Structures are given as C-alpha cells and as structure tokens.
Design a protein with these regions (language model features):
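N-terminal secretory signal peptides that target proteins for export/translocation
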Residues: 1-14
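Bacterial N-terminal signal peptides
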Residues: 14-31
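Beta-propeller domains with acidic blade repeats across secreted/periplasmic ectodomains
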Residues: 38-414, 425
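Structural beta-strand segments of beta-rich domains
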Residues: 413-417, 471
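Short, surface-exposed alpha-helix to beta-strand junction/turn motifs within ectodomains of secreted
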Residues: 420-461, 486-497, 521-524
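Blade-terminus and WD-like Trp-Asp/Gly-His loop motifs, strongest in beta-propeller folds
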Residues: 463-467
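Surface-exposed, short loops/turns at beta-strand junctions within beta-sandwich domains
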Residues: 477-482
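Intrinsically disordered, low-complexity repeat/linker tracts enriched for polar/charged residues
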Residues: 496, 500-502, 506-516
Length: 531
C-alpha cells in the first residue's frame, strides 16, 4: 500500500470516529422524542382502515367476446340472477352468491331489447323497462331462452336522440313500475313525456306523475317504499342529486312543461317557472309543486355522474347500515352511502363515501336480502376512473364493522352524529376534532354551477352521549339551502374489544382510551329545512 493510500484510510477512520462521537454526545444532550397520545393515535390511524377490510369486491368472469354492460339485476325464482346489458341482452348467472368466477355461470336469456335499464319479476314474467316501453318476457318451453315478449305500457315517445334513456323501478306497493324519462338532450323535450316520471300500471296504462326530470342515472325505493331517482349535473341542476318522486310534483327542470296539457287529468295546472339564476330553496318557497333535492352530491368530491340506487333491506347482513340507501357513480366508479330523515315533511339527509375501486363506471345496483350488493357498469360513451369497458361485480360484507359516521341528523341549532362504534370521549368533545364548510349552487338554465355562497359555520360545542355512540354538535351559522360539509379528522374510536372487531353489538363495551380514526371523515348534509 502506498503512503498516499495509508493516509486516505487514516483520514476516513478519523472522520467516522468523529461522527460517531458527535452523534453519541448529541444523543446524551437531547433524549429521544417520546410520542404524545395524540401523535400515537394519528400514527395508528395511518396504518389501518381500508375499505377492502370491510367490503370485498367479487368480480364475475363474463364469457369471452361478450360485452356485458350491466345496467340492472333481478333474482329469478330458481335462484339465478338476471342481468341486463346496455347492448340489449339479458343474461342469467348461475350460483350468483358463490365465490365462483367462471364464464360458465352465464347463459343468455334474451336479446334484441332496446337498452334495458330496469327489471322486476312477477307471476312468471320478467318485466323489463327499455327505451320505448315496459315489456314482459318469459320462457314457455323451458329451454332457458325467452320466447314470449309482450308490451305492457308504452305511453311515451322517443326521437332517436341518444339521451332518451328510460330507467325503470321495481314494482311499487300498488303494483306500478315507475319510469324516469330523460329529456331530448340536456335542455328540451321533443317527444311526449320526455323529462317526466310516469307510472306503468298493471293494466297497461301510462300515468304522467312527476315533471322536472333532466338526465336520470337510476331509480329505486327506500325502506318505506318511497321512490327516488338520481339526476345529473346540467341545466337547472347545479350538481348531481338524489330526488324524491311524488305524484303532481315538479323536481327542477322546466324543459318538459309543454306536456302539462296532455297530463292535465293527472297533474293539474302547470307550475310557475323557476327564476333563472336563483337558489333552489328560494324557488321552493315560491313554487308549491317544487320538491327540492333530498341530497346534493358535491360535484368532483362525491362523484360526477350519479347512477343506480339500492336500499339495504337485508336486516344487518350487509353490516351496520340497515335501511340506508346506496348510490353508484359512473364517472368515479364508486358506490356512495346515504342516510335520510324527514324534516317538515320533506326528505333530506347526508351522503358519505363508501366503496371505491370498481372496475368501471357504476350504473346498476341491486341489494339482495342475503346482504349481497350486485354492481354493474359501463364506460362506453363516458369516461370513468375504472378502466374496464364493462363489469359485473358484487360487494360482500366481511363481517367486520367499520368505524364510521352512521348518520348525520339535523337538530335544533346543529347536528347529531351517530357512530357505528363507541367514540373516545376526549376526541368526541374536543371541538377541534371537527371543521365545517357550507355552500350551495346556482339554480339556473345554464349548464351546471360552481359552488357559491360559501360560509364556515362555527362549531361551538360537542357533547358525547352516555353510550358513546352519539355526539351532539351545536353550530353557529347554519345555512338553509346549503350543503354542510363536515370534516371529522380528529375523531377516534374508543379502544375496541375483540367482539366489536368481529361486528358484534357495536353499542356494547368500549374501554377508555383512543383507538382508530374514522374510515371516512367527510359527510355532506343537504340542509333544506330546519327542525
């Protein structure tokens, strides 16, 4: 080794020794930082809470060469699941509740339909809502193929415009199928009852029922049997929304008002036209027939194209969300969750994120009594976060209860939050655990609206109930007609018992101390009416 190499080695060793000494002396002077309880809770929350821990996605394998753009589902008497496609076909899935994923499960039942967007089964017939009518079909010879097709009701018209979809409900308690009919394009109605909801009766009548429809994405019922549909951002719709359908009501878009003369016997006189550029609750106070949106879905936050509707009537087989509604979004490829209540006789409520990561844009949803949520989708003609062209999937509850805001309810001077699991008292009663913003949308004939009239209501107090499942928030500055965005990033659960982790009795137990953060910290309440 040369003298130069020896010198280099000695210099490196000296530098390393000095660095070690400096580190050691610094450690003696400054002890290692000890995490506070709040920091520990924050660190823990980053490691847990994935949606897939609670709701697993099961994907079906569609036969090769088949583009099954699933729009609606219906259980058949033999246990098979009928699934309709935008491409005019109806397929049957064998053993739809199993973990099996094989193309052999699928068999085509019918074809030649015109974009079917709703199905139900009654008295040996599969009823199908398609673009021009409600039809019923059946297999008479038992070969697994539909061979009899009958038109039940067709009292509306079509022009060929691609917007003119027809979404059909299940049978209501009176035996009617509700059909929501898209306008001709976004702004007008060039064919009879376009921009209306109608009811197809068992004896073949078409009853004009509700005006003001723009561009529906789905239709369904809540646990009480009341009918709702989703409408999408556009003229007279600042953002996407969930709306309550009732006879003789108007739900927002005046583009179909020209048909009141034909509907006079069912609907009465035409309502007053809304003022362009107003706010929707200002107009609701002026127009008795106008029923404002029950829930507004903030555009770009909760989705961009609200679609299919399902209600959890499984009595706990889908987790803690009994009787709540679920709404798909085509653009975001997600399923949202909704809780509603009646205030002054009107439905209103909150929406929450629920499950993302579906294969393509969600269109069809169906909740089964066994707690299986079937999901279908497409992205043909529209973009979606999910990259596949179509999908047939199912959401299964894993048996674990997520720590979530179960409900956000309006109370005098604020909101009550109900949780799925007991909440840590210190975080629940610390007002810094919460923040709130409010905003609304312009009610206008132009396409959509930005968020406007923004405010920041102030949370003045937070009180936890004795069972640790409810928090009462008193808030200054609530705004009628606004979406109230609640952010609860500081909330922590009480330390959980093993039984609660398995989904048993979420209201029981719960020792002192902090557990996990909320799976989803955001809730959006549409405050139309004050209690």
């Amino acid at each position: 080794m040369s003298i130069r190499s020896v010198l280099r080695s000695r210099i490196r060793a000296s530098v390393a020794s000095a660095s070690l000494a400096l580190f050691t002396s610094a450690s003696l002077i400054a002890p290692i930082h000890s995490l506070t309880a709040q920091e520990k809770a924050g660190a823990a929350s980053k490691q847990e809470a994935k949606e897939s821990d609670y709701y697993a996605i099961h994907s079906f394998e569609v036969p090769e060469g088949v583009e099954l753009e699933a729009t609606s589902f219906q259980r058949m008497p033999d246990g098979k699941m009928a699934v309709a496609s935008r491409r005019g076909e109806i397929w049957l899935i064998e053993n739809p509740d199993s973990d099996k994923a094989s193309a052999e499960q699928f068999k085509r039942f019918a074809h030649g339909m015109h974009e079917p967007l709703g199905m139900d089964y009654r008295d040996g017939w599969l009823y199908v809502t398609q673009r021009p009518d409600v039809s019923r079909i059946r297999d008479n010879d038992g070969d697994g193929q539909a061979d009899e097709f009958e038109v039940v009701a067709d009292g509306w018209q079509i022009t060929g415009d691609y917007h003119e979809y027809a979404f059909g409900s299940k049978f209501d308690k009176d035996g009617n199928i509700w059909v929501v009919l898209c306008l001709t394009g976004s702004f007008g109605s060039d064919a009879l009852y376009r921009g209306w909801a109608v009811r197809a009766t068992a004896d073949g009548k078409t009853l004009p029922t509700t005006s003001g429809i723009r561009s529906p994405g789905g239709i369904g019922m809540n646990a009480a049997g009341d009918v709702f549909y989703t409408d999408n951002q556009g003229p007279w719709n600042g953002t996407c929304a969930l709306k309550h359908l009732m006879p003789k009501k108007f739900v927002g878009h005046p583009g179909g008002f020209k048909w009141y003369e034909q509907a006079a016997s069912e609907m009465g006189a035409k309502p007053k036209e809304p003022k362009d550029g107003s706010r929707f609750m200002v107009e609701a106070d002026k127009i008795p027939e106008y029923e404002p949106p029950a829930i507004l879905f903030p555009y770009g936050k909760m989705g961009q194209s609200a679609a299919g509707i399902a209600c959890d009537t499984s009595d706990g087989k889908f987790g803690p969300f009994k009787n709540q509604m679920f709404v798909g979004d085509q653009t975001f490829s997600t399923v949202m969750r909704c809780s509603m209540e009646k205030v002054q006789g009107h439905y209103q409520g909150a929406c929450y994120p629920f499950r993302e990561g579906l294969d393509c844009g969600v269109v069809g949803l169906q909740m089964e009594p066994n707690g299986k949520l079937f999901v279908g989708g497409t992205n043909r003609g529209w973009g979606s976060r999910g990259t596949k062209s179509f999908c047939v999937q199912r959401l299964d509850w894993t048996g674990k209860v997520p720590f979530e805001i179960l409900e956000m309810k309006a109370i005098k001077g604020g909101f009550e939050l109900v949780f799925t699991q007991p909440v840590d008292r210190a975080s629940a009663e610390d007002i810094s655990s919460y923040a709130m913003k409010s905003f609304t949308y312009i009610y206008q004939g132009a396409y959509g609206s930005p968020e406007v009239d923004a405010t920041e209501p102030q949370i003045k107090s937070a009180k936890l109930s004795s069972d640790a499942l409810r928090v009462e928030l008193q808030i200054e500055g609530l705004q009628r007609g606004h979406v109230h965005h609640l952010m609860s990033k500081g909330i922590r659960s009480a330390v959980q018992t093993s039984s609660q982790e398995k989904g048993e009795s979420p209201g029981q137990g719960g020792s002192q101390g902090q557990g996990r953060g909320l799976l989803h910290t955001d809730a959006y309440y549409t405050l139309n009416y004050l209690p």
